Amino acid sequence: MKVQKSSKKPLKRSASFTNGTKSGSKSMKSSKSSLKSHKKIYKEIFDSEISDNESFDSEISDSESSDNESSDNESSDNESSVESSDEESEYEIKKPRRIPSQYSKKFTDNVLDDESDDDNQSDNESSDINSDDDNNLNELKNNVIEVNKSLSKNIISNGDITDIRNIIYEKIDKEISKGIYGTFNVLIMIHNGYINVTKVIQYVTTKKKKFNDWKSTKQAQELIEEVSSVTGIPVAGLFIAKNTGSKKITEIRGTYAHPDLVPHIVSWASAKFGHKVSKIVNDYMSKKMFDKHEQLIKGKDDKIAELTRKIDKQTSLMKDQKSTIKEQDKKINELLSKSNEVLGYAKDTNRKITHVVKERVPYSDEPKIEHQLIIMKNNDEPIKPKKGEKAKKIYGYTALRIMNKSKSATMNRYYKDHPDGETVLTIDYTPNAMHLWNQCKMELIEDEKIRPGGTSCSSFNLRKEYSERKLKKDIKRIHNLRLKHPE
């Protein structure tokens, strides 16, 4: 806006543009360095305000646009009134809410034009103007901060990072709020986090899909039953319908569903969103397993780093001892002896780690080749021997070491020899069933808890005061110890 001077009296510059300058020709005087600082601070304030407001929805942006238009019209009216009046000695333009960049440039040019007419003013006046400018700019900054604080009151804070209500950014009323679910807006209940799936389906799909179409599918019914079972909420309580004719509530009416159902409903309505959900789940599972591997590797790296630190320390000590040849030889011999101990410890540790790694095998991707260890109770009846034959020794238990793909055939052969046999214990997964049973048998025989079969390495009897319950407990303990990762 270009300000014209009156022929009778000097015009008074508005507080919003001059930030507290004096009336008359003195109010038009400011140094070029003050003007550049003035323009730079204005740009930082309004750029910051624009950046903060862009994160809110289109309703806030529309409101700000209408405010800017009304502010521009107000400035235009003031300009015409100043030019037409010859007797008015003072005028005042209200401070606009925001000065667009094109008006900011025009304002700067006008001030530069006015400066050329008052170059002979004293430096003291310029100093006063700069002081007033700083005060008013600080006031403007405070106003911008107050605006941002008022907007931040709409955001709902929650201490639980897994609560779905963390997506809320603005309240509609005491029950319903707006939220951002992925890349689109949703309506969410404040007290329980239920989301309006009717509106979501309308938003994400171009086809005429309805919520009841999804709910009637067999997959949806099974999912609803599962969510109800896990959460303890009745099936009817997983959905809340808001049906009202009120104009105010039209925006929020529809069916609100439990948060655990929403990803499946939206994936059904939008293939694009379904792909995003698959990507998130796959990334989560991959990262989870990756973190486990990283922890295992880190444990080994820490041990190696500790050994390396010890060796480095010894090497450093060796380099520091060079006072005399005798003393040096003595120190070297001592350090060599210690180094040999460390190296021996390192080799022993490395051997143990290698052995542990071979046994600590992760789960196989092929279930058919996974091993199982099954302890069977034979329940055989004693058979009277024929004349001239020795009585056949009866064993109470048999250890079966099988793979999943041959389990059926192995069990058939067992039941053929032991029709009344029953399962006592099953280890569903073990890296090596043969190795596990050999280790169990060796420990149980040494502790005099079982008597092994003479010709069969898998048949055995329990010794007195050693029960079947204790047998199961010991085998599980040995199995868990083998699968435990090294510390």
From Swiss-Prot:
Pfam families according to UniProt: DUF3627 (PF12299), KilA-N (PF04383)
Composition bias type Acidic residues, residue spans: 47-77, 111-136
Coiled-coil region(s): 290-338
Ranges where the KilA-N domain occurs: 175-284
Bias-annotated ranges (Basic residues): 1-12
Top-level taxon of origin: Viruses
InterPro entries named in the record: DUF3627, KilA/APSES_HTH, KilA_N
UniProt KW Magnesium keyword: no
Keywords: Coiled coil
UniProt keyword annotation of Cell inner membrane present: no
Biased composition (Low complexity): 22-34
Segments for region (Disordered): 1-137
Protein name: Putative KilA-N domain-containing protein L37
Organism in which the protein naturally occurs: Acanthamoeba polyphaga mimivirus (APMV)
